[in-house]
């Protein structure tokens, strides 16, 4: 999971030193961040999560060979999702236009320095990731210079560009260029409890503005507040199928849901996702469904969480929302769901 927006003036050297290498149940490379108290991937493993949560629901096969596929990845982290996407597009003959929103270059650098990570990918995939890490972009063909940036390397099919920095500040730049044109958004930030900056109703609304009519927003996250934020952005929301078998994720992925998919269009039931259940809809209407807010796109995590607690208390006092404990009791769920 890519590092999301952090507090101002954080020394990246210190953050890098904190990252530790982990291995998931599938044996794939991953990292752990003590700062956020979370792994970059679920306990299932990075490769399995990338395939089941992001690649499979994207249904790349619905795009024709030679067609351009525009993808935005929120928090790139180790580059595992991107690597799998690169190889999937190459296999299907798709021209990938990729945009990454990422604060910290360290996770990708650490991954590329590890044999365990490199052994997972084809040489062309590694060359593209290396070019992205070194130059912040890749470009098929001439390696032409773009927007005053340094020349992009001639690696991989299509093109890719990393927008470094706080995603809340770089997203407007992307909106200027790709509003209503994005086929897929892969949202892989740290969980809302630890990185609420990238799960606010305002941020989700801007991402929704990027989506093409048939575009899909996809994430591991099943949080009621996030789903409510997507609903407020006028997106149709469905639940991803629960991965089975395998241990549950440590990334806010309850046993009854494998994540969330959202779109401007109706999401017909499939083997990959289903309509939200009555239990999940009630979850959105209780205290847990109070969305995260950041109207200035500058608030830190503590302030966002504090303001949400105030909003939750107000909604409860006015009878606008039920308590989450009452919801859990009604559905026989354990604390923390």
Features from the language model and the residues they span:
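Class I SAM-dependent methyltransferase Rossmann-like catalytic core
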Residues: 4, 10-69, 78-92, 109-112
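SAM/dcSAM-binding transferase cores
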Residues: 17-22, 260-337
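A short glycine-rich, Lys/Arg-flanked "PGG" loop and its adjoining helix->strand segment in the class I
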Residues: 197-214
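The AdoMet/dcAdoMet-binding core of the Class I SAM-like
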Residues: 60-143, 150-180, 186, 306, ...
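Conserved beta-strand signature within the Rossmann-like core of class I S-adenosyl-L-methionine
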Residues: 184-186, 213-221
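Conserved Class I S-adenosyl-L-methionine
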Residues: 227-258
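A short SAM/SAH-binding and catalytic strip from SAM-dependent methyltransferases
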Residues: 183-198
């Amino acid at each position: 999971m890519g590092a999301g927006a952090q507090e101002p003036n954080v020394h990246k050297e210190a953050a890098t030193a904190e990252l530790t290498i982990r291995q998931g149940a599938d044996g794939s490379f991953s990292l752990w961040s003590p700062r956020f108290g979370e792994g970059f991937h679920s306990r299932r493993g990075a490769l399995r999560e990338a395939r089941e949560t992001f690649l499979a629901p994207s249904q790349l096969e619905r795009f024709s060979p030679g067609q351009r596929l525009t993808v935005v990845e929120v928090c790139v982290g180790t580059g595992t999702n991107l690597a799998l996407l690169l190889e999937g597009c190459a296999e299907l003959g798709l021209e990938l236009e990729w945009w990454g929103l990422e604060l910290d270059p360290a996770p990708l650098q650490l991954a590329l320095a590890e044999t365990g990570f490199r052994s997972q990918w084809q040489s062309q995939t590694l060359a593209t990731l290396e070019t992205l890490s070194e130059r912040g972009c890749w470009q098929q063909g001439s390696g032409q210079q773009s927007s005053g940036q340094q020349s992009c390397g001639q690696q991989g099919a299509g093109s890719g560009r990393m927008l470094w920095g706080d995603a809340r500040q770089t997203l407007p730049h992307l909106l200027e260029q790709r509003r209503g044109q994005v086929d897929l958004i892969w949202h892989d930030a740290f969980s809302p409890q630890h990185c609420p900056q990238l799960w606010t109703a305002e941020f989700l609304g801007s991402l929704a503005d990027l989506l093409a009519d048939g575009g899909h927003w996809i994430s591991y996250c099943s949080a009621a507040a996030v789903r409510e934020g997507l609903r407020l952005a006028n997106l149709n929301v469905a639940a991803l199928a629960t991965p089975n078998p395998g241990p549950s994720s440590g990334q806010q992925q309850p046993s009854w849901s494998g994540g969330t998919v959202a779109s401007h269009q109706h999401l017909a039931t499939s083997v990959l996702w289903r309509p939200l259940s009555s239990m999940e809809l009630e979850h959105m209407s209780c205290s847990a469904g109070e969305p995260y807010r950041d109207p200035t796109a500058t608030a830190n995590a503590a302030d966002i969480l504090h303001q949400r607690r105030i909003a939750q208390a107000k909604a409860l006092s006015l009878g606008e929302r039920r308590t989450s404990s009452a919801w859990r009791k009604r559905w026989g769920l354990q604390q923390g769901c």
